[in-house]
């Protein structure tokens, strides 16, 4: 049985999330500049513009339709980031039972955050993202499903191509954390990498959805927002990272991250568990899905049902994998999922 985090800890997490997002915004736009609106393909986006010598610089901020971003634009002059207070909140939340990443994982995600990866609509996926659901959903997640020796980051190719901004090369960012990181040459292109490994075999992967031909599988996609570095195209990833949510990793003073919506993460795990060659990873997929299904059936039943129905309606192959993945769930989780989906009709 899952243990809920007490109400006091949930309140502290909400404060940490707010302060971390404010700190993120404050740190990104320290120059003496101003926010402007730009229109692209019938949508408006915030950009930050400042003078650098005799040049006018411009940085993408986010869509005007995002109420949280627009609110911070309006409050920008009054935002004050308190790192010490955030550290205190992190310590209190860890003491309350919420998970914290191992130090290396925390530093890697923090480095990507500071480099602007999440500002450029990148998404943290995999087990590190799963850790971040504890605070969002207000539950303890146990220990075994939280263990990892890798970090996975994803971004839509279309976003990367058209956002008009870029982080530094991933290898440079990672070597700022651990100088033993090296590129892992890709079999299809030895001059570009999607994976990086350090001296202790910790892996960092960059991924992008494959919504096209099967010919793209196993290849490298160059990502403009990753300074031209590569990402591995994967099926089903577009479903996972569609309309993500924000959370905080409990590292240092809190690291604000963008993660998949929990209901999509759960359904996606049922799909990918079927394709896994590595049995241990497949078991972990099902374990994480089962935990989230139990929580979401109470916290977000309509959203869980909608995520399932969206995946189910995608096509015959998706339905086959969903059925197979669901059958691998513990009996109680199978029943919970079935009742949640049927109850939403």
Named regions from a protein language model:
Residues 1-44, 51-345:
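Compositionally biased terminal segments of proteins
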């Amino acid at each position: 049985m899952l243990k809920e985090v007490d109400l006091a800890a949930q309140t502290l997490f909400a404060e940490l999330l707010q302060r971390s997002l404010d700190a993120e915004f404050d740190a990104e736009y320290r120059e003496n500049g101003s926010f402007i609106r730009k229109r692209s393909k019938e949508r408006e986006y915030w950009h930050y513009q400042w003078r650098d010598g005799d040049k006018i610089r411009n940085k993408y901020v986010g869509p005007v339709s995002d109420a949280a971003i627009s609110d911070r634009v309006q409050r920008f002059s009054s935002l004050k980031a308190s790192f010490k207070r955030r550290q205190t909140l992190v310590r209190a939340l860890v003491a309350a039972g919420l998970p914290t990443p191992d130090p290396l994982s925390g530093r890697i995600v923090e480095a990507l955050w500071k480099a602007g990866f999440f500002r450029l609509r990148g998404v943290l996926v995999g087990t590190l993202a799963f850790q971040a659901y504890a605070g969002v959903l207000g539950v303890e997640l146990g220990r075994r499903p939280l263990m990892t020796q890798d970090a996975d980051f994803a971004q839509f190719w279309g976003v990367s191509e058209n956002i008009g901004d870029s982080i530094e090369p991933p290898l440079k960012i990672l070597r700022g954390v651990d100088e033993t990181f090296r590129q892992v040459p890709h079999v299809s292109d030895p001059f570009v990498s999607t994976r990086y490994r350090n001296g202790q075999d910790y892996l960092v992967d960059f991924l992008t959805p494959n919504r096209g031909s099967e010919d793209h599988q196993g290849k490298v996609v160059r990502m403009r927002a990753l300074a031209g570095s590569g990402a591995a195209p994967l099926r089903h990833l577009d479903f996972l990272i569609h309309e993500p949510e924000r959370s905080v990793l409990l590292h240092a003073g809190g690291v604000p991250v963008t993660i998949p919506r929990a209901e999509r993460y759960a359904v996606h795990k049922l799909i990918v568990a079927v394709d896994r060659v590595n049995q241990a990873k497949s078991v972990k997929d099902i374990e994480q899905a089962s935990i989230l299904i139990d929580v979401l059936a109470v916290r977000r039943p309509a959203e869980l049902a909608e995520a399932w129905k969206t995946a189910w309606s995608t096509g015959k192959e998706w339905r086959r994998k969903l059925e197979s993945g669901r059958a691998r769930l513990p009996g109680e989780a199978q029943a919970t999922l079935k009742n949640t989906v049927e109850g939403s009709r």
